[in-house]
């Protein structure tokens, strides 16, 4: 590594550390547990939006369940490839984790057209058929219908993911889909309301 590369890396780290210091100061007192706060401050860092202090909701076992799943080499099922692109695949692969999105698969597209469904719904159904949901981390940042279908698969077809990250953004069904997840016993991390998006899921 050249000196310039080392300096750029150090500069980037200093900028990030400075950003987190600003977040910690401006956020002030909060009721998040330490592990939860690490998530919330990264969401604020990605969005520059302190409203997420009020929007982020955690199941009591969310952090420990997510960490345990990663250490066990879980599947990470995402609704859009943008989330997959933002994850550190090398680091996850070192734990044995695999990142998967079925939303662009030909059979998923065909089924969505045939059933007048959505690709997001059919992608989650495919993941369940293939046995990929049990013990998985499911990260939904774009498609509320994927989140709604995940809840149905849990309630009606005994899917048992380790953690649901439910942060779809939008005006139609986004807020409602998150409320459905909040009613589950399955560990979850949710950004309630309309706000969200793939950068938050990452």
Language-model features, listed with the residues they occupy:
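N-terminal glycine-rich anion-binding loops that anchor highly charged ligand groups
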Residues: 31-45
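Short, basic, glycine/proline-bearing loop/turn elements
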Residues: 46-54, 163
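Charged, compositionally biased N-terminal leader segments and the immediate start
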Residues: 1-34
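Short hydrophobic beta-strand that contains or immediately precedes a catalytic carboxylate
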Residues: 76-78
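C-terminal functional extensions of proteins
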Residues: 162, 172-202
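Conserved mixed alpha/beta catalytic, RNA-binding, or beta-rich assembly cores of soluble enzyme
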Residues: 80-156, 161-162, 170
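A short, well-structured juxtamembrane/interface segment
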Residues: 54-69
